[in-house]
């Protein structure tokens, strides 16, 4: 069926908007941990500089949460463009468009959306442990926090962080920091202990949860440990 001139003009007028909006509908990275809405700092840091104890929100994290997208559409006004860790967010009158970019590529924009990297979960102070794991991806994060990703058979199992300044377990930092460096360099299997009272978001696009590190035990092949 032929298309008349009026219909064709209408289709051509809305096509750019449809293509622009297609960025919003792209599939998110499967299985990543999405920071909750209350972790977002609305105005972020100036020119890519997220404040201490925060980091830039990523494209995948924003795409993976309809709640985060709805929140940002609600709090942004006008023809506003914000930096993400690896892209940009077009808020306000743009309608909430998420665009891909390179890490740090949009930090010349005035405002970056950042997330607070520490959350009190409300869970009880219960010991959780994970056996036969090795420490990888050592990260010196904000506020002198030291983190590691613990893997088993090459797959991430849990992340854990220790800090000298914040959280309930700051007094254990010196000992745990030395242990982390030791097992990371040696590549030895351990049993790692965490408390899920405090959850962290130091790693971008993490496929594992990260909590407060409370202990490390070296696996002994001659015993039942690990």
Curated annotation (Swiss-Prot):
Spans traversing the lipid bilayer: none
GO function terms (MF aspect): toxin activity
Pfam families: APT (PF03440), Pertussis_S2S3 (PF02918)
Coiled coil: none
Main location: secreted
Disulfide bonds, paired cysteine numbers: 50-114, 147-161, 219-226
GO cellular component terms listed in the entry, alphabetical order: extracellular region; host cell plasma membrane; membrane
Subcellular location: Secreted; Host cell membrane
Matches recorded under SUPFAM superfamilies: Bacterial enterotoxins, C-type lectin-like
Segment forming the signal sequence: 1-27
GO terms, biological process: symbiont-mediated activation of host MAPK cascade
Keyword tags: Disulfide bond, Host cell membrane, Host membrane, Membrane, Secreted, Signal, Toxin, Virulence, Whooping cough
InterPro entries assigned: APT_dom, APT_N_sf, CTDL_fold, Enterotoxin, ToxinB_BORPE, ToxinB_su2/3_C_BORPE
Subunit and partners: Pertussis toxin contains five different chains, S1-S5. They are organized into 2 functional subunits: A, composed of S1 (which is toxic) and B, containing S2, S3, S5, and two copies of S4 (B binds to the membrane receptors). Dimers of S2-S4 and S3-S4 are held together by S5.
Function: PTX oligomer B binds to receptors on the eukaryotic cell surface and facilitates the translocation of the toxic subunit across the cell membrane.
Family: Belongs to the pertussis toxin S2/S3 subunits family.
Protein name, entry field: Pertussis toxin subunit 2
Organism of provenance: Bordetella pertussis (strain Tohama I / ATCC BAA-589 / NCTC 13251)
Gene: ptxB
């Amino acid at each position: 069926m032929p298309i008349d001139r009026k219909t064709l003009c209408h289709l051509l007028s809305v096509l750019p908007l449809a293509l622009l909006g297609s960025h919003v509908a792209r599939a998110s990275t499967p299985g990543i941990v999405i920071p909750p809405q209350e972790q977002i700092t609305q105005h972020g840091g100036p020119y890519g500089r997220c404040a201490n104890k925060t980091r830039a929100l990523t494209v995948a994290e924003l795409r993976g949460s309809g709640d985060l997208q709805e929140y940002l559409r609600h709090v942004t006004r006008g023809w506003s463009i914000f930096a993400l860790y690896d892209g940009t967010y077009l808020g306000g009158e743009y309608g909430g468009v998420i665009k891909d970019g390179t890490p740090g590529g949009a930090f010349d924009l005035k405002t970056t959306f950042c997330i607070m990297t520490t959350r009190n979960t409300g869970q009880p102070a219960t010991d959780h442990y994970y056996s036969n794991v090795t420490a990888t991806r050592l990260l010196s994060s904000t506020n002198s926090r030291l983190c590691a990703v613990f893997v088993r058979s090459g797959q991430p199992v849990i992340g854990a962080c220790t800090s000298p300044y914040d959280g309930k377990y700051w007094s254990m930092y010196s000992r745990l920091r030395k242990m982390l460096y030791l097992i990371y360099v040696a590549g030895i299997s351990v049993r790692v202990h965490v408390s899920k009272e405090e959850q962290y978001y130091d790693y971008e696009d993490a496929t594992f949860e990260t909590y407060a590190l409370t202990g490390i035990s070296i696996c002994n092949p001659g015993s039942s440990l690990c």
